[in-house]
């Protein structure tokens, strides 16, 4: 008899995230990079919820960092440059992914994230990395 909690056979297939050399970003950051189909499905989910897609990119650091203070601050790496305007009225996930491709073409060494805004409640509902630079 054991006192260890187990979820059965699945315990054998669980992995530990390597803590060295791996930065955490946004939602889904513990998973491998999204394939094109997975990216389309995430954007489709965002649109199905009625959220407005918006793209942002960051050239230097794609993660939260403490540059000005040792304790966390709201401005340290959280604000990125917006790519064009939010995509109000967009209903096609392929259109959003095409814009991601445009950001990557213009700034290949940038981190690119997709954000979904609820324009009624005026809040950000989802945010995930759509592209990480080759050098990362």
Swiss-Prot record:
Keywords: Calvin cycle, Carbon dioxide fixation, Chloroplast, Photorespiration, Photosynthesis, Plastid, Transit peptide. The keyword Plastid applies. The keyword Chloroplast applies. It is found in: Plastid, Chloroplast. SMART domains: RuBisCO_small. Its main location: plastid. Heterohexadecamer of 8 large and 8 small subunits. RuBisCO catalyzes two reactions: the carboxylation of D-ribulose 1,5-bisphosphate, the primary event in carbon dioxide fixation, as well as the oxidative fragmentation of the pentose substrate. Both reactions occur simultaneously and in competition at the same active site. Although the small subunit is not catalytic it is essential for maximal activity. Belongs to the RuBisCO small chain family. This is Ribulose bisphosphate carboxylase small subunit, chloroplastic 1. It comes from Pisum sativum (Garden pea). The gene is RBCS1.
